[in-house]
C-alpha cells in the first residue's frame, strides 16, 4: 500500500517561483521608480532655491550693472553668465541671461519693417497718444535664470522684467537688427551672433543667439557713425561662419560692417551654409596625365567679398594675405578641408599664376571633376 503525502509538483513549484519573481521584480521596479522620483523632486527643490536666490541677487543690483559677460548688453562691468553650485555633493549649473526689451507702452523703436515691429515690439500695437517712434527702445531688461544638473537636464527656470528707477529719456544709442539665413533663404535658429566695436567707449563685445526666425536684436549700442566700425560675426555648429567687412574705396561689401546713428537702427542679413569637414581633393597632373608632386596649388572662392562683378576678391584665398597653398603628394594629390560651399578658382583668375613646382609656374589647362578612387571623396 502506497502512502500519499501533501506537497507540490515540479510544475506547481516552477509556476510559484515565476509568480514570486514577477512580484519581487515589480516591487523592485516600483521601489526604484519611487526612489528616482524622490531624488528628482529633491534636486528640483534645490534647483528652484538656487534659481530664486540668483534672481533675487540680480534684482538687488543697480540697473546699469545688469549685464552678463558675453551677453547682449554693453556695460562697464559684467556678471558671470554661469555659476557652479555644489549642494549635498551634487553640482548644479546656474545660468543667467539678460536682454533688453522694447515695449509698445511708450511707442515702438525704429524697425527696418512693419512686420518686424509687430513681431518684436512687445504688447503691440502702441496705445493711443504714444509717440510714433520710441527714441529709447530699450524699455526694460528681461532676466532669465536656469538651473541644470551635470547631465544638462533643466531643473528650474525663472524669468522677470527689471526696469530702471529713473524716468526714461531719449537715448544716445542705436539698435542692430541681425538676421541669419542659410543658402536656401531659410532662417537659422540657434546661430551665435558676436558684435564688436573697439572704437566706442566702452568697447562693444556682445553676443546673442538667433531665435526661431533667425533674428537677433541688440539695443542700446553706442553710436558709431563713420568707417563701419561695427563688425558682426555669425556662426553655428555644422555651418560656415561669416564676418562682415568694411568697404574698400568704391567697392561695397557683400556683407558689410555697420555704422550706427543715435536713435536709429541698422539691419544686416548674413548667409551661413551647411558644410562638412572634407571639402576638396585636388589631383594635379601634367598634360600627359603624369602626377605632379610637390605642386603648390593656388585656390580662392567661397564667399565673394564685394558686390562688383569686376572684382574677384573672395573670403577664401590661400595665397593672400598669407601663403597657405596645399602641396601635392607623390601621387599629385592634395586635400583641403573646411571650405564653404560655392565656386572656386584655381591658379588665379586666368589660371596663370601661383600654381608652382619649385620655381616653375604651371598654367591651368583644365579643371575637371575628380574621377579617382581615393577614399576622401569631394562633397
For each of these PLM feature ranges, what is it?
Residues 1-8:
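N-terminal leader/signal peptides at the extreme start of proteins
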Residues 8-52:
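Aliphatic-rich helix starts adjacent to a transmembrane/signal segment
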Residues 42-184:
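Low-complexity, Gly/Pro-rich coil/beta segments used as flexible assembly/activation regions
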Residues 169-183, 267-287, 296, 300:
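A short, Gly/Thr-enriched small/hydrophobic beta-strand-prone motif that recurs across taxa
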Residues 184-203, 287-319:
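Short, ordered, surface-exposed loop/turn motifs in non-cytosolic proteins
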Residues 199-220, 304-335:
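Short, acidic Ser/Thr/Gly-rich low-complexity loop/linker segments typical of extracellular
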Residues 225-233, 341-348:
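A short tyrosine-centered beta-strand micro-motif
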Residues 235-268, 326-327, 346-379:
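Structured interaction patches on ligand/partner-binding surfaces of diverse proteins
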